[in-house]
Amino acid sequence: MPDLKERAARKEPGAAESASRESRGGNTRESASSAQGHRSRRFNRRSSTAALTPGSAQGRGVQTAPRAPVGHGGLRTGLTSRCPQPSARAKLPSVTRGAPLPPSPGKGHFGATPISHRLGLTERVHDASKLDCHLEDRKSASSLESRGKEVMPSDFWDHLKEQLSAVPPDFSCALELLKEIKEILLSLLLPRQSRLRNEIEEALDMEFLHQQADRGDLNVSYLSKYILNMMVLLCAPVRDEAVQRLENISDPVRLLRGIFQVLGQMKMDMVNYTIQSLQPQLQEHSIQFERAQFQERLNKDPSLLNHTTKWLTQAATQLIAPSGSCYDIQDPSSSSGPSPSDIAIPEPLSPAMVLSQGFLNLLTWDPENEEFPETLLADRSRLQELESQQNQLTILASVLLVASSFSGSVLFGSPQFVDRLKRITKSLVEDFNSRPEEVMQTVSDQVTEEIHQSLKNMGLSPLSSENTDSLIGQLQNIAKKENCVRSVIDQRIHLFLKCCFVLGVQRSLLDLPGGLSLIEAELAELGQKFVSLTHHNQQVFAPYYTEILKTLINPVQTLTTKVGSL
């Protein structure tokens, strides 16, 4: 708290100017050094930050939330009209940590509401439970909005530079900026951090800073250093490097601009953390709410599960009498040893296998088939996205498999070559569904040229004309649905997803079927999305699936197996 001299200086600035400046400077230095002294304790606190242990989180099927930034709060909407607005004026969602979730609606709450509206509300709750927590990644670096934020706010910083360079300096914009920074710092604090709150309130006391500005001795550089020390104390580990880079900036305007930018990122970190910390509650609330809404609709329409029953019946029939396939055809990259194919279909049938087969069937669903399972209507668009992603991976893996059979381990032993070939193929197959023949013609030309150039760079013999023609022909044949290489890869990706549903993604990645090792990272992403979607759906509709599967599976088995225990 300010001492008596400082308080007297505020009341009589003309009589106690020297004492006030001296006293205030001492307090500010003490606050800055105090924040600086917390560096080591901050890192100690990181190691002891409360987090869900693997046992407690995974045992309940809840993903562990990342370490929280030290505080939370919301950005203000903008500076006053006297100054142009800076670039970090991000409009963030207003999220309050610890805010209670809305209670589940009671019986009859939607009594007069149309069913279509209730279904829409259920879908919105369903979407909220799957909210993307990485908000800052939503915009491309080359997007129009991103470019605008880089160019337009330069007016503010140019204006600030002109004001600080004037004789005498004009601190009006600097004061508005310091006020905004102060509020951001305060918003990053937790309620229990009262000592830090008092430090910030004292060091960035706007009344006193206005007095200094009126006298022309406001030390912007010194205040910036204090703010940096406080940011070191408050930022999440991911921002340490960015804050450290700011310490090397000597120009006051560039430093303030960097501070404001990093503070915006720190705010986003807190929003992301708050959302992630609420995910388990959102998911649990979503499960209960979706099930209650579905049961209400089922009570009014007993035929609501007809399509779901037909969907599961078809899956069980496929497992009892599987159709022949070319899955056993070997490819040049396959290796000896066990793979997920060794655990293909257990006998007799189990609820897990019927459900996994049913979920996989949705990835090849005929768009004209209107008998889509009622329990998965809210996820239909997500399933279509997964289908598109899986189809692109099928084409990518097929291209890599064919290319490796011609160039061998010489080129495909180079991670740089494989990554380059994957980038080329990925960029070209995005339009595969609309024009497969044309796309594969381009892919075959690009891949052949890449192989030829790489062999030449390594001093190796290029492909013969015969091998080149054969490579181009095999790559172009991938455009046909009946192509056996494409069919093999497609079935193996489906088998991988089935293993993910039963065993989990990490265990399924340990023994990938032949031909899939080069797309392991992409498969892991696909598998995680598939498992997340299907497990949530299973949790919501487990009671209904259990009742349906009782009529499809040997009753003796079902007595000891329940869908909910998978």
UniProtKB/Swiss-Prot annotation:
Highest taxon in the source lineage: Eukaryota
Keywords: Cell projection, Cilium, Cytoplasmic vesicle, Developmental protein, Differentiation, Flagellum, Membrane, Phosphoprotein, Spermatogenesis, Transmembrane, Transmembrane helix
Phosphoserine modifications at: S104, S461
Biased composition (Polar residues): 25-37
InterPro entries: Tcp11 (IPR008862)
Keyword flag Phosphoprotein: yes
Biased amino acid composition, Basic and acidic residues: 1-24
Chain segments annotated as transmembrane: 393-413
Post-translational modification: Constitutively phosphorylated on serine, threonine and tyrosine residues within the head and tail regions of noncapacitated spermatozoa. Phosphorylation on tyrosine residues increases upon sperm capacitation within the acrosomal region in a protein kinase A (PKA)-dependent signaling pathway.
Coiled-coil ranges per UniProt: none
GO cellular component terms given for this protein: acrosomal vesicle; membrane; sperm flagellum; sperm midpiece
Stretches with biased composition (Low complexity): 332-341
Region annotated Disordered, chain positions: 1-112, 328-347
Example GO BP: germ cell development
Membrane topology value: Single-pass membrane protein
Location of the protein in the cell: Membrane; Cell projection, Cilium, Flagellum; Cytoplasmic vesicle, Secretory vesicle, Acrosome
Subunit structure of this chain's protein: Found in a complex at least composed of MROH2B isoform 2, PRKACA isoform 2 and TCP11. Interacts with MROH2B isoform 2. Interacts with PRKACA isoform 2. Interacts with ODF1 (via leucine zipper motif).
Biological role stated in the UniProt entry: Plays a role in the process of sperm capacitation and acrosome reactions. Probable receptor for the putative fertilization-promoting peptide (FPP) at the sperm membrane that may modulate the activity of the adenylyl cyclase cAMP pathway.
Family as reported in the entry's similarity comment: Belongs to the TCP11 family.
Name of this protein: T-complex protein 11 homolog
Phylogenetic lineage: Eukaryota, Metazoa, Chordata, Craniata, Vertebrata
